[in-house]
A protein has these predicted regions:
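Enzymes that bind and transform nitrogen-containing heteroaromatic metabolites
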Residues: 1-174
Length: 174
């Protein structure tokens, strides 16, 4: 299975100034367009509850799986329309979730944040590809893209300019 980590970050490696800040507040429209395109291509997005709360709604035409420790949310798994819009709240380890999705025939997923979720999937060595958009901003403090996961070797696949100011980098995990 392809497990694709997608993140936008500041030049100094921050994905937000605080845990309740949406990346939509400071990233380029081209980065948003890339995220929409890639997540529609895979059809399945995994993110943490805090990241979901910054978005506040399901993503049209995609299956959104929200990792949460709030057991009361787990019963709120909803198929919202015939176009594949689906919202699920789960309390599973990354490995268990990936095994379940593979058994369902899912071929690729996007890991959409935040830092804790990125770190969890990296720690378990599940990520196969990383797309990072570098935005032209530096935050004096904030949320790191990931931490506490050990060294990971990457192979540079390519880069692309998004708009006039942002750069999208693609790496494969080796």
């Amino acid at each position: 299975m392809k497990i694709i980590l997608i993140a936008a970050m500041s030049v100094n490696g921050r994905i937000a100034q605080s845990t309740n800040q949406s990346s939509l507040e400071w990233t380029s429209k081209e980065d948003t367009a890339f995220f929409v395109e890639k997540t529609k291509e895979t059809g399945v997005i995994i993110m943490g509850q805090k990241t979901f709360e910054t978005i506040g709604k399901p993503l049209k035409g995609r299956r959104l799986i929200v990792l949460t420790q709030d057991k009361s949310l787990e019963s709120q798994n909803i198929a919202l329309d015939e176009n594949g819009t689906r919202l699920e709240f789960v309390n599973e380890t990354p490995m268990d979730l990936i095994h379940r999705l593979e058994s369902e025939g899912v071929e690729s997923v996007v890991i959409g944040g935040g830092s804790f979720v990125y770190s969890s999937f990296l720690r378990e060595r599940l990520v196969t590809d990383i797309y990072v958009t570098i935005e032209p901003v530096m935050f004096g403090s904030g949320v790191p893209i990931a931490e506490s996961f050990g060294d990971i070797k990457l192979r540079f696949v390519g880069s692309k300019t998004l708009g006039e100011q942002s750069v999208l980098l693609h790496y494969e995990v080796v």
